[in-house]
Regions:
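Conserved Class I SAM-dependent methyltransferase catalytic core
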Residues: 100-153, 376
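Conserved S-adenosyl-L-methionine
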Residues: 4-9, 14-22, 100-104, 131-133, ...
Length: 439
């Protein structure tokens, strides 16, 4: 008996390919036009496994083009994508309305194309709101398997209240999948750093400030059931259903090393002192508050500082949010991929954190107005916002730009490969000349 549950939609058996600047076209997977070579402009021959790459084009075409270069050769450690939410609204920089079958195929096809390039310890994070997140989870179950699901992370994207709605929506959801499964991925993911600002030195310990934790452990262990006498003379036993954290011998050693703290003027239950180098990281919660990772408004203010004379995105993501995702899912120099670059937040955060990155944006005007100028500011050390201070970022590194024309439809004006590369080349050469002049 087959117990598989499947989401079905019109034209599911077809492939959805980019056509022209913003359209899509349904094609048979055997369509001979799919074997036609892609038109790629940029320094493909100069790309290496260490390159950071901004690709102008559709995500499917970009992955195919990069597959012929060394860029993806070591595998992708993190995919973070923030696709159009399909809210049926129009925003400053883009329209957000696709027929649902197209939206579903668009997401499915790009996840399918990413899968062969993922490392064994990779994770895929898809950022959505309530418009399509439930259907997206069904698609991700189909592409990666239900057993690959790790978590649904809820991000508090705003702190102001919307009084015109039945409910004031203040969250997005990040669906997290690990193709190797959550148990194996857990072994390689990073914990959150404990806030060392919370450490205190309440007894002037010469080893420095410390935190403390209960000197108890769950469960009954005979060797860890014994009397402890507090400095005030009280005799304590472990609480019901628990044991002391360690054996009596270990407790005596810790006590002699001044690693045991008795609160309430020496009459409280023992607690173990933990210094900064002994602190274990924190397992991430599935709810991320605005105070920890910022809001859309925080990100918007950052963009307005970078582009004071331009109408910026309505719902950009803060670098602090991406910093947490990238910290959990990667280590320095590993590859981060985003197929929906927008203003370039993912690549900007990855660059400041010294990760390699590939970011893809289909809209050439968005790239010229936001993505490329922002990333050049990061490289030149001219972006003081976001996570710059946290990582003491002062500039450095480099990036390459490719233009991948769609196989279907036509591009006109500035959107054509040669015209775009001319404008992008001007931005790049100006930035490099300025770097040489100030270096």
């Amino acid at each position: 008996m087959n117990d598989a549950v499947e989401l079905v939609w019109p034209n599911k058996d077809l492939s959805l390919r980019a056509s022209g600047l913003t359209s899509y076209e349904w094609v048979q997977r055997t369509d001979c036009r799919l074997s036609k070579p892609l038109k790629v402009e940029g320094a493909c021959d100069g790309l290496s496994a260490r390159s950071n790459v901004l690709v102008v084009g559709d995500g499917l075409d970009a992955l195919e083009a990069l597959g012929a270069t060394p860029v993806l050769g070591d595998g992708i450690r993190l995919v973070y994508i923030d696709p159009p939410f399909n809210t049926q609204k129009t925003f400053n920089q883009y329209g957000d309305s696709l027929a649902r079958p197209m939206w579903l195929s668009m997401l499915r096809d790009r996840l399918d194309a990413l899968r062969p390039h993922l490392r064994e310890d990779a994770s895929v994070w898809v950022h959505l709101d309530d418009s399509e997140v439930h259907r997206a989870r069904a698609i991700m179950d189909e592409v990666f398997g239900e057993s690959a699901f790790v978590a649904s992370v809820v991000w508090q994207k705003r702190t102001s209240r919307e009084s015109r709605s039945a409910f004031s929506s203040n969250h997005d959801t990040l669906l997290v999948y690990a193709p190797s499964g959550p148990r194996r991925w857990k072994a390689s993911r990073n914990l959150l750093t404990k806030d060392e600002a919370l450490l205190r030195n309440r007894d002037d310990d010469p080893r420095g400030p410390w935190a403390d934790a209960p000197f108890t452990a769950p469960g009954y262990r005979k060797a860890q059931q014994y009397d402890i006498v507090t400095p005030s003379g009280e005799v304590l036993r472990p609480p019901r259903g628990r044991s002391w954290y360690a054996t009596a011998k270990t407790f005596e050693d810790l006590l002699a090393d001044d690693r045991i703290f008795f609160p309430r003027n020496g009459s409280g239950s023992p607690r173990i002192k933990l210094f900064a180098h002994q602190l274990r990281g924190l397992v991430p919660f599935t709810v991320w508050g605005a105070a920890d990772v910022g809001t859309n408004d925080d990100a918007k203010r950052h963009l307005m500082e970078l582009f004071p004379d331009t109408s910026v995105f309505d719902t950009p993501k803060p670098e602090e949010l991406l910093e947490r995702v990238i910290h959990i899912a990667t280590n320095p120099h590993e590859l981060v991929v985003d197929l929906f670059a927008g203003s370039g937040t993912t690549a900007a955060a990855a660059h400041k954190m010294r990760r390699r990155w590939v970011t893809v944006e289909r809209n050439t005007q968005t790239v010229l107005d936001f993505t490329l100028p922002r990333l050049l500011k990061v490289v030149r050390g001219e972006d003081s916002g976001g996570i710059t201070g946290q990582f003491s970022w002062t500039g450095g590194g480099s990036l390459e730009v490719l233009h991948v024309a769609p196989r279907f439809g036509a591009l006109t004006g500035i959107h054509r490969s040669s015209a775009f590369m001319g404008s992008a080349g001007t931005l790049l050469s100006t930035a490099r000349n300025e770097q040489r002049a100030t270096g």
